[in-house]
A protein has these predicted regions:
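Extracellular/periplasmic catalytic domains that process cell-envelope and extracellular macromolecules
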Residues: 26-29, 61-62, 83-84, 97-100, ...
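Metal-dependent phosphoester-hydrolase catalytic domains
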Residues: 170, 184-195, 202-304
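Active-site beta-strand/loop signature of hydrolases that rely on acidic residues for catalysis
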Residues: 31-38, 56-81, 107, 146, ...
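Extracytoplasmic/secreted proteins, especially bacterial periplasmic and envelope-associated proteins
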Residues: 51, 55-59, 76, 80, ...
Length: 304
């Protein structure tokens, strides 16, 4: 059984910095999965990448992540995460033609999981061509997936991690179509347990209304909602926000732009209905009083 306990100092720090505390204990067989846009190296001072990556790792440790997907991570950032998180292995590659640049890596605790196979493909009309993109997309976009086997329970699941385009709504829609057609639907047809995480650069509507998100799980999709990649993925998977057995913790919205007050919910964790979601949280941590990224990570504790 994996147990996570917070000491007195950690509790004091949590109160001081207004963060969402980690669960006191995980039941045998449960694990914590998360999505974290770690922000590319585009800032200076306290927000510089080499200052922020240790904070990212601190969030991972504080909340007991067992497996998580990152977005925007470049090789220099990954190198720090590797040093800070020696118990973790990762799979995936960069999005550019030379497989460099920003990556959508999947990190997993090597003591907890075996990676049986993995792949990165491009969200384009030619998914096997590195660096390819849809017309109108601001940059190449990818999906990395891994078939993981839990060393505790022996159960397997397929984990997809992605980052949709920030410029073109059409590219976001098309990209999700590729991801579902190439990855999710075949895995579902085989009866596999699936997780999909990522920064989708999209909300259901401009109001960013939780009730509207919840409506995706019923028969009330409108034609306008069907044009949204969130609605599209929700035809295949469920938003874990609405699956949690306990109330959501932390802010509903996830992107805060280093301001601390998030403006929209664009970071998601989806899963197949067989997943037992124990908790769902947006982690509003500020390790040492400083931001780790311009996005707050989202984490779920689950059982299979």
């Amino acid at each position: 059984m994996i147990k996570i306990r917070m000491g007195v100092a950690a509790v004091i720090a949590a109160v001081a910095f207004g963060c969402v505390t980690a669960p006191g204990e995980k039941a045998a067989g449960d694990f914590t999965l998360a999505t974290f846009n770690v922000r590319c190296p585009a800032d200076k001072g306290e927000l510089a990448w080499y200052r922020r990556m240790p904070r990212v790792a601190q969030v991972v440790r504080d909340h007991g992540f067992d497996v998580f997907g990152v977005q925007e991570a470049v090789p220099s950032e990954v190198k720090i995460l590797e040093a800070e998180l020696p118990d973790f292995a990762h799979v995936g590659c960069g999005r550019e033609a030379d497989r460099g640049g920003e990556s959508m890596l999947i990190f997993y605790n090597r003591d907890r999981f075996n990676c049986l196979t993995n792949e990165t493909f491009w969200l384009s009309e030619t998914p096997d061509r590195p660096g390819s993109r849809y017309t109108g997309a601001g940059c190449p976009r990818t999906c990395t997936w891994a078939l993981l086997e839990d060393r505790v329970t022996g159960k397997r699941f397929r984990y997809f991690n992605t980052h949709l385009d920030h410029i073109s709504s059409k590219a976001r829609w098309n990209g999700m179509q590729v991801l579902l057609e190439r990855g999710v639907r075949p895995a579902k047809a085989r009866g596999e347990t699936i997780f999909l995480t990522g920064d989708l650069n999209e909300t259901l509507d401009k109001a960013d209304d939780p009730a509207a998100i919840a409506a995706l799980h019923g028969p009330r999709l409108t034609e306008s909602a069907k044009e949204n990649p969130i609605a599209l993925v929700s035809t295949e998977l469920k938003d874990t926000y609405g699956m949690s057995a306990t109330p959501h913790r932390g802010t509903y919205k996830t992107f805060h732009g280093f301001k601390g007050t998030p403006s929209c919910r664009i970071d998601y964790i989806f899963a197949t209905p067989d997943v037992k979601v124990r908790s769902h949280a947006t982690l509003n941590d500020k390790p040492g009083g400083q931001f780790a990224s311009d996005h707050y990570p989202v984490a779920v504790t689950v059982g299979l």
